[in-house]
Amino acid sequence: MTLTERLREKISQAFYNHGLLCASYPIPIILFTGLCILACCYPLLKLPLPGTGPVEFSTPVKGYSPPPADSDHKQGEPSEQPEWYVGAPVAYIQQIFVKSSVSPWHRNLLAVDVFRSPLSRAFQLVEEIRNHVLRDSSGTKSLEEVCLQVTDLLPGLRKLRSLLPEHGCLLLSPGNFWQNDWERFHADPDIIGTIHQHEPKTLQTSATLKDLLFGVPGKYSGVSLYTRKRMVSYTITLVFQRYHAKFLSSLRARLMLLHPSPNCSLRAENLVHVHFKEEIGIAELIPLVTTYIILFAYIYFSTRKIDMVKSKWGLALAAVVTVLSSLLMSVGLCTLFGLTPTLNGGEIFPYLVVVIGLENVLVLTKSVVSTPVDLEVKLRIAQGLSSESWSIMKNVATELGIILIGYFTLVPAIQEFCLFAVVGLVSDFFLQMLFFTTVLSIDIRRMELADLNKRLPPESCLPSAKPVGRPARYERQLAVRPSTPHTITLQPSSFRNLRLPKRLRVIYFLARTRLAQRLIMAGTVVWIGILVYTDPAGLRTYLAAQVTEQSPLGEGSLGPMPVPSGVLPASHPDPAFSIFPPDAPKLPENQTLPGELPEHAVPAEGVQDSRAPEVTWGPEDEELWRKLSFRHWPTLFNYYNITLAKRYISLLPVIPVTLHLNPREALEGRHPQDGRTAWAPPEPLPAGLWETGPKGPGGTQTHGDITLYKVAALGLAAGIVLVLLLLCLYRVLCPRNYGQPGGGAGRRRRGELPCDDYGYAPPETEIVPLVLRGHLMDIECLASDGMLLVSCCLAGQVCVWDAQTGDCLTRIPRPGPRRDSCGGGAFEAQENWERLSDGGKASPEEPGDSPPLRRRPRGPPPPSLFGDQPDLTCLIDTNFSVQLPPEPTQPEPRHRAGCGRSRDSGYDFSRLVQRVYQEEGLAAVHMSALRPPSPGPPLPQASQEEGTAPEKGSPPLAWAPSTAGSIWSLELQGSLIVVGRSSGRLEVWDAIEGVLCCSNEEISSGITALVFLDRRIVAARLNGSLDFFSLETHTSLSPLQFRGTPGRGSSPSSPVYSSSNTVACHLTHTVPCAHQKPITALRAAAGRLVTGSQDHTLRVFRLEDSCCLFTLQGHSGAITTVYIDQTMVLASGGQDGAICLWDVLTGSRVSHTFAHRGDVTSLTCTTSCVISSGLDDFINIWDRSTGIKLYSIQQDLGCGASLGVISDNLLVTGGQGCVSFWDLNYGDLLQTVYLGKNSEAQPARQILVLDNAAIVCNFGSELSLVYVPSVLEKLD
């Protein structure tokens, strides 16, 4: 068993056990699921759900004035301004963007020196801003006059009163962590701990206090012990109530004069106005609510047609609750994780949850209600989940793989969507497996057995349903036709064989193909590819940055690389998405970063300088506020009870400030405990993975950014998905026996459907069958009409058996066998030599030597030993493994003794040798005269003298030789047996009396196939011709015997009187050249006759007048098997291994499939599938409507053609001394029955299913009569 098969079996077993758990304890599981839903939706109670994202509108700074409050001043005039751009904004936001670095960097500096000194300069900047005064001709303006004055915080924010300003200007900076007191900052030994002390204990929310005070996202700030880029970024946020252009201009000029940025190219041209809609908008919820209402109605009206469901409303409501709960859980978890949507792509997330959730509901419902209805509820739930386990896990793994690939493209839009999708998939899978499955088990449990029988329509009790393409005239006949007394009616599993309405067909089509999920996955892949291709700061930038950072070249080896500003910006604020600036510190190979210092490292006395990093500015720095959560500004104003719903704010152009600090300032600002603390990690980590470090010197709680854990978890999941992907590719690209010298080691392989394993092993039983003995050689032809069974061996002996009791009713002697019944293995050897000596040609003297055409070996004649003596080497028995069966003490009526010699005397060889001499003489006469001599008394008289069936227990009769030829084909209908011989003779025998009724005496080409249908006989001959006969029965008043030679016209053939009825056989039509080569397959049904030949063609004839309707061409080899039924569905198989389905009404080919590696040996169809077997010892089951291969069953060697269909959902196959029963719908091995110890070494060569639920197995010269086990009758 391969790794994939073991994994599939484990998954199936896990789902089976989970189904048993859900069905056994439904109430506790529903309560547990409800608590989980409430817990995941708890964040929604505190954090209101957003409607849509904020809307932006830009205006130029030059000549800006607030719009008038009267919205009617421009009515009737076309304008590009939005409707909400009316009146003054709530506030004007002015950000002073500070970039600071310590340069040049010394090796004795610590990691904490990267941000301690730059943060200390924030206090000086705040003082400069507060002290700025505008003096002009109109007077003086200070900050207190133009800024937004705030009052108290909300009562629930007492912890933030020492951090946020009250009763003054709304001015925010990182200094607020220390109440804008430099002494507090200087005395703080744990800066990072102070910054993160107000962070939530679980995960960061969308707008944290750190983001509010720093004004930039946390990963862009550079305040981290593990960042490689020694640059700190933060903003000082000023909130103005009125727009004063002169004051703002003077403030910008003063700050840029005090802290110039020589390489800054930021544009100060536009104001950006941001409008915030209502957080809960009814208009935005209408489409989503409408979608769920439509979902409820669709599921309800669809489940009204499912009779296996008790409560239609309950199932529809459960489906809607499942999908809605999945959405709420997803949004709640995303809110808890801080994953708030900032792009329009996040708004389609609820609708994706609806689509995926609906499809999973349909899949689970279809799988569970398709299980057998007579099983216990928990077993039905377990089987339903187990059957879809592999499909569910495969789809989930595929979706997660696509999401992981999209996440690691490092495109922000794709990452946000992927994070939303991961949460949605996990929550949806959780609810499907727990909530909906449990509710479905409760609903099915309420379905009473009486209620089930009452709801089932009468068509469900029929053995077969209406297949696709059946003419309307057969539908009524099938519905009212009662079952015959000897036909077992097997109840089909659930309702899968019923005529489904269109709405259920749509549901099952979606559930079977998972079309919606596949389209979503394909669309996601295309969308990710487009964004990766068009995003300038995505994966390519990140890879280029990694190559630049990890370059082993020493300092000064390469100069700055000129990069276009539009493609790769010189300094992106995100360390993970940026390249080092041209002057970034490049260390030699033997030099470590400051983060690589070991614990308790002592700074070196000697200082080695490296090139100072140059602070650069790029276009992305102009709108860094866009990377903040869209709740950033509403959260800040909500703290002061100011709402931004249906209002807007205006963002002024950023004021850039660059700070360069020398190492001496960094050393002076260092805390005494910094040198004694292990601040640096043992190894450097990529930028952006770590944003926080240990809390303090005391070894307290470590504040790690959740990004590391997310990346680690996603990386592990990506590795698992990659391994599974490689396994799937191995399974698809490599054959089953890849790397193995032979076939599978097991006796039989299960089906390949995921529903094959239900967690239990199929039972194996052993029964003692009825053994039908009496043939001297291997049985070649079998025929039955339900009550009688006729068999014929290679010796030409025909036996008629009672299919109910197994008794031998009649033995029809072959007219003149050349050997005694004691021949055994000697005659097998003799037959082989005779076949070789005949050269494959049938002669009247040797009628038993010509088997059917496809089995006749050809070869040179044996060398003669003496010139005038016959060759007696054929009498030597070299088969020492075959022993003569001992005579039973009390022979049973149904068992015939194999030998007629007595125990007193030895074996008499005289007759055997004498026959060989006689055969030599007869052969010489045959070669000279080309006409056989008279064999003695006429055959009808011999049959009449022999009488009817011989007495039970009497030895076999010795028959005289004849020129009739060996039997090549055999058919049975009623009490008449039609025999086709190699000499071309057609015989009709009475199966009860054992007498010859009539025959066609004209010597012609051998009859290779027969059809006996409604008193019409069609004989296919070796030369490719067809003969159509009709039988007539006349009641004669006196025994009469007719003599004469039959003619080929309309005159009757010579009938032979039998009992009181005379059967006459008339040749009505002849098709002399139906095919160019021998006809190998012949079938008739629904008034049509189909022939298959070695000339690669099939022909369709009308049975009543032998008119050729169609010539079907589609095979590249000889036709080996043909199937046709009353629904005008025709299937054919050939030596090319192909299977073709044809429409008999139009003569067109419906499908063509290469099914086997070799000849197709047998072919049959049910209402839903096509079953084929081949010389490769595989039985393949195909979907009849689509032509898709469902699964395969590997047979034992030599048992490939031994199969039979008991009903539309039950298949029987033969093996080494056993028969196996399979469920056709799923490929499950239901039961294996061993036929006693005597048959273990014998393969079942042929299986014939009788109408009385009996199975006839051909084990060489013996037949075994087996009845369908009662266990299977109950299962069906």
UniProtKB/Swiss-Prot annotation:
Domain of life, per UniProt, equals Eukaryota
GO CC aspect terms: endoplasmic reticulum membrane; ER to Golgi transport vesicle membrane; Golgi membrane; protein-containing complex; SREBP-SCAP complex
Q: Which residues are glycosylated?
A: 263, 590, 641
All ranges on the Cytoplasmic side of the membrane = 1-18, 301-312, 366-401, 445-518, 729-1276
Summarize the PTM comment: Ubiquitinated at Lys-454 and Lys-466. RNF145 triggers ubiquitination of SCAP, likely inhibiting SCAP-SREBP complex transport to the Golgi apparatus and the subsequent processing/maturation of SREBF2/SREBP2.
Q: Where is this region: Disordered?
A: 60-81, 834-903, 928-958
Q: Which residues form the WD repeats?
A: 771-811, 949-999, 1002-1039, 1074-1111, 1114-1152, 1155-1192, 1194-1232
Q: List modified residues, type Omega-N-methylarginine.
A: 1048
Annotated region Loop-7: where?
535-710
Q: Name one GO molecular function term.
A: sterol binding
Note down the stretches annotated as region Loop-1: 46-284
Cross-link type Glycyl lysine isopeptide (Lys-Gly) (interchain with G-Cter in ubiquitin), placed at 454, 466
Q: Where is this motif: ER export signal?
A: 447-452
Enumerate the subcellular locations listed in this protein's record, separating them with semicolons. Endoplasmic reticulum membrane; Golgi apparatus membrane; Cytoplasmic vesicle, COPII-coated vesicle membrane
InterPro entries with a match to the protein in the record? Beta-prop_SCAP, HMGCR/SNAP/NPC1-like_SSD, SCAP, SCAP_N, SSD, WD40/YVTN_repeat-like_dom_sf, WD40_repeat_CS, WD40_repeat_dom_sf
Transmembrane region positions? 19-39, 280-300, 313-333, 345-365, 402-422, 424-444, 519-539, 708-728
Membrane topology reported for the UniProt record: Multi-pass membrane protein
This protein's domain notes: Loop-1 binds to loop-7, enabling interaction with COPII-coated vesicles. When levels of cholesterol in the endoplasmic reticulum increase, Loop-1 binds to cholesterol instead, thereby disrupting direct binding between the two loops and preventing the SCAP-SREBP complex from exiting the endoplasmic reticulum. Cholesterol bound to SSD domain of SCAP or oxysterol bound to INSIG (INSIG1 or INSIG2) leads to masking of an ER export signal (also named MELADL motif) on SCAP possibly by moving the signal further away from the ER membrane.
Q: How does it assemble?
A: Membrane region forms a homotetramer. Component of the SCAP-SREBP complex (composed of SCAP and SREBF1/SREBP1 or SREBF2/SREBP2); interacts with SREBF1/SREBP1 or SREBF2/SREBP2 through its C-terminal cytoplasmic domain. Forms a ternary complex with INSIG1 or INSIG2 through its transmembrane domains at high sterol concentrations. Interacts with PAQR3; the interaction anchors the SCAP-SREBP complex to the Golgi apparatus in low cholesterol conditions. Interacts with the SEC23-SEC24 complex in a SAR1-GTP-dependent manner through an ER export signal in its third cytoplasmic loop.
The Swiss-Prot or TrEMBL record describes its family as follows: Belongs to the WD repeat SCAP family.
Q: What is this protein called?
A: Sterol regulatory element-binding protein cleavage-activating protein
